Amino acid sequence: VALINNQFLPYPYYAKPGAVRSPAQILQWQVLPNTVPAKSCQAQPTTLARHPHPRLSFMAIPPKKNQDKTDIPTINTIATVESTITPTTEAIVDTVATLEASSEVIESAPETNTDQVTSTVV
């Protein structure tokens, strides 16, 4: 155990020999592409190892535009309704029983008049 006295440490620091890495391990740490020095130390641009596609769980996917709206059928309110005039012929039957002022029973059939009436239905 080595005693390290430093003016910036309020108490003496004891370094353990097992905590010191070998030069080969330190070299591996310096070669890693993920290490980025502080911004003040970046004299030359460094390349960061990035994934070509970020994970989908971290991506915010905006909803589709047509999901926000409810499909409402378009109704053309300007279109005019053309009414077709259809002539309709109805038979009107008038049944008139002619009664005389006498008390005798009339055995004849009642008169039947049939008139043709034409009306227009809109």
Curated annotation (Swiss-Prot):
Please give the residues the UniProt entry marks as glycosylated.
74, 84, 86, 89, 95, 102, 118
Keywords (A to Z) from UniProt:
Glycoprotein, Milk protein, Phosphoprotein, Secreted
Residues modified to Phosphothreonine = 98
Question: What biological processes does GO assign it?
Answer: lactation; protein stabilization
User: Mainly localized where?
Assistant: secreted
InterPro entries documented for this protein: Casein_kappa
Please indicate which residues carry the site annotation Cleavage: 58-59
Instruction: Name a GO CC annotation attached to this entry.
Output: extracellular space
Identify residues that carry Phosphoserine: 102, 119
Q: Where in the cell is it found?
A: Secreted
Tissue range of expression?
Mammary gland specific. Secreted in milk.
Primary role: Kappa-casein stabilizes micelle formation, preventing casein precipitation in milk.
In the record, the note on similarity to other proteins reads:
Belongs to the kappa-casein family.
Protein name stated in the entry: Kappa-casein
Native species: Rangifer tarandus (Reindeer)
